[in-house]
A protein has these predicted regions:
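Phosphate/diphosphate ligand-binding glycine-rich loop within oxidoreductases
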Residues: 34-41, 47-159, 281
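Short, structured coil segments at secondary-structure junctions
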Residues: 61, 133-134, 195, 215, ...
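Rossmann-like adenosine-cofactor binding region
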Residues: 212-289, 295-296
Length: 322
């Protein structure tokens, strides 16, 4: 394994889940695998769970870790070819990438959507430059259109807590004051479509996710109807993906608070567990009583980020030896 950007890079999910539960029993089982190997984590955007869990995962495997915050202390980077660099950007990404790669064995990149150009975002311009020019294994720590480490942790959590063989899992849009990328819902849909679950997506009209992520999932515009009999509710906001109206890409089309996940919504489920990737806007995405209920999984879900990252880095390290 050399790259990790989506569910297909991981291969068979049952095998990956078995590895995850093996590692959860003994986080240090492979502590010598990363000896004398360095993991470089490059952050173009803020992070809490990804930053901490990925560093912890790398150290579980015996790796050294370097963390670079591109916008704090490093030179400002130009990402476009052909640009006359007479502004405030001192270094081009095309030189910076091979330089950074020379100091490490594996690279993680976190770079959000800019909402300036849908094509640039959905072709993963920044992440793919690292894949193309670094010559090293590269993994996504959340890119413009996907967050596979989060989705893998979500799947681990569902597998741990499910009460039936094939649970009903609902991804629901919820309101937020800002325009947020589609990375988390895209990846969640990507992974749930490969898992053994009854998967439903619900959102207001105009918020249709890209078909390559939705695939065969049922889409329901009536949120209450979607929630009926659900075993897991996964709440997340996302800005308009621009699928039906490209000119609306990245816009906030609605802040309809009736989509906030509250006790009335949860009452029509089958005593469903509540999930969210965090950070969460309380009483916009979800009410206090729901996120604080015993059925809220946001903390164990976040803890599983260490496990998903450990499995991923283990696979990449084993790929170096192949």
């Amino acid at each position: 394994m050399r790259y990790f950007t989506n569910v297909h890079d991981l291969g068979d999910l049952k095998t990956a889940l078995a590895e995850a539960f093996e590692i959860k029993k003994d986080r240090y089982k492979y502590e010598n695998l990363g000896k004398h190997k360095t993991c470089l984590l490059i952050f173009f955007n803020n992070s809490l769970r990804t930053r901490l869990s990925t560093q912890k995962a790398a150290r579980n495997l015996g790796m050294d870790v370097i963390v670079l915050d591109v916008n704090q202390g490093a030179w400002k980077l130009e990402t476009e070819r052909g640009v006359i660099m007479d502004g405030d950007k001192s270094e081009h990404l095309l030189e910076a990438i091979p330089v950074m790669a020379s100091y490490c064995d594996i690279i993680g990149v976190r770079s959000f959507a800019h909402f300036e150009n849908r094509e640039d975002d959905y072709t993963e311009k920044i992440l793919n430059q690292f894949i193309k020019y670094s010559g090293k294994p590269v993994f996504s720590m959340e890119a413009a259109t996907g967050h596979p480490l989060q989705a893998f942790a979500d799947l681990i959590t569902i597998e741990e807590y499910k009460k039936k063989e094939r649970p009903k899992v609902v991804l629901t849009w919820a309101p937020h004051p800002r325009a947020l990328p589609q990375a988390v819902p895209n990846s969640f849909a990507d992974w749930m479509n490969e898992a053994d679950v009854d998967f439903v997506i619900t959102h207001p009209e105009g918020y249709e996710l890209d078909p390559k992520f939705v695939r065969g999932a049922k889409v329901e515009y009536n949120q209450m109807k979607a929630f009926e009999g659900a075993d897991f509710i996964y709440a997340k906001n996302w800005a308009c993906p621009g699928v039906t109206r490209p000119e609306d890409y990245g816009k906030v089309l609605s802040k309809d608070m009736s989509w906030t996940v509250d006790a009335a919504h949860m009452a029509v489920t089958d005593n469903a567990f509540f999930m969210h990737c965090l950070p969460v806007r309380r009483n916009m995405i979800v009410t206090d009583d729901v996120i604080e209920a015993p059925t809220s999984l946001v903390i164990p879900e976040a803890a599983n980020r260490e496990i998903s990252a450990t499995v991923l880095l283990k696979r990449l390290l084993q790929g170096l030896e192949a």
